[in-house]
Amino acid sequence: MNNILYIGPYKENTGMGRSARRHIDALGYNFDINLSIRPIYFTPYLDTANESGKDYSEFEDNSSSYYDIVIQYGIPNCFEYKKNFGKNICITDIDTFNIKHTGWVDRINLMDHVVVQSEWSKKSLEHAGLKTKVSIIPEPFNLTQFHSNYDTLFKNTNNDFVFYYIGKHQDKNNIKGLLSAFFLEFRKHDDAKLIIKTDMSGFDHQEAEKIITYDIQHVEKVLRVNGNHVQAPHVIIGYYEQEYIMRLHNQCDCYVNVCKAESFGASAIEAALFDKLVITNREIGSNSYINSYNGFEIESMLTNVTSKDFYMENTFTVYEQWKEPFIDSIREQMRKAYETTKIEKQQKLKNFDKDKFSETSFVNNIINL
C-alpha cells in the first residue's frame, strides 16, 4: 500500500478546486492507497456551501510518518520539494505559451516529476526550459455519472439543435467570439439555439447580467446584425450545483470550445463523455483528446495575450501567447456539427476513448510514474 500526501485547493469553488476534488475522489477510494490530504488556497472563492457535496474529513484527519508519494497540485510558485519523503510529484495547469518570465519552471525543475493534462501544456513547459520528467495524464472522472437519466432542464418542443458552452466570462474563454460566430452563421428561422452558462468572479448576479447583456448587444453592433433577425442566446448566470451542469450537458447537442488558452478543458471532456459532439480550438488543452477524428477542430493562430483578467501579476501578460480562433472557422465547424448525420455522429463518438479518463486509469498512471 502506498502512503500518499495530496496538497491541493480542494476547498475552493473554482476550476482548480473541482479538479482537486476529482483527484481526491480517484486516489482516496482506492484500496491500494492510504491517502492524507491538506488544503492550499489560491483564491478567496471557497466552496462554503459544499457545492461538491464531499466530506473529506477522513483524509484530512489521516497522517503517516512517511509518505511514498507527495503530490502538490496548484500554481508552481508554491511548490516545495519534500526531501524527507519519497517521490515528489507536482500537477499544474499551464494555459498559455511563453511563460519563462513567471519563474514557474525553476520551481518545477526541483520536483521529481511534473504532470500536465495536455500536449499544449507540455510544449509550453519545455519551451520555458523544463528539465525534470514530464507526463501527460488527463483528469479523472467518475464515468458512472455520465448517463441519460437526468431530468430535463429546459423545454425544447421544436427539437432544436442546441449548441452550448460552460465557462467564466473572461477574455481567454472568448465568449464574444462564440457569439459572433453564432450570430453570423445562424438566423432566427434556423432550428439552432445557443446556451451559455457563465459567471463573473467579483460581480454579483445583477452586475454580471448587465455586463453580459451589454457585451451581447456590443457584438451585434460590431457585426452590424439586427438583433430582431438573430437567434438570441440563452445565458445562464451564476453558480450552480454539479447536478445542474450534468443536466445541461445531457440535454444539449454540441459543446463549442472556443477558448484561446486552457490546460485541459474539463467541460469539453464532460460533454464528450455524455456522447455530445464537441468543437474545440486547435492545439489548446482539450485538443489533445478531441480532434477531427472524434469531433471538430477550429483553425487558429498564435498571438500575444491581451487580457484584463489575471489571478497573479505575472500571468496572462502580453509576453505570453495563446491561440486566437478564426471566426470563419468557428462558423464552419458549427455548421458541420449542425449538419452531421446520425451515422457520422455515431462514428465520431465511437472514436472517443472514454476509458483514459477513468479514475482507475488516473491512479495507475500516477502510481507508475
Predicted regions and their residues:
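A charged, aromatic-enriched C-terminal amphipathic alpha-helix characteristic of glycosyltransferases
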Residues: 321-332, 339-368
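N-terminal pre-catalytic "stem/leader" segment of glycosyltransferase-like enzymes
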Residues: 1-67
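Nucleotide-activated donor-binding/catalytic signature segment of Leloir-type glycosyltransferases, i.e.
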Residues: 205-243
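Aromatic "clamp/platform" in nucleotide-sugar-dependent glycosyltransferases that forms part
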Residues: 260
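Extended catalytic core of nucleotide-activated donor transferases of GT-like folds
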Residues: 5, 44-128
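Acidic anion/phosphate-binding donor-loop and adjacent secondary structure
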Residues: 103, 140-159
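Short hydrophobic beta-strand element within catalytic cores of glycosyltransferases
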Residues: 277-280, 296-297
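Conserved donor-binding/catalytic core segment of Leloir-type glycosyltransferases
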Residues: 5, 155-173, 179-182, 194-196
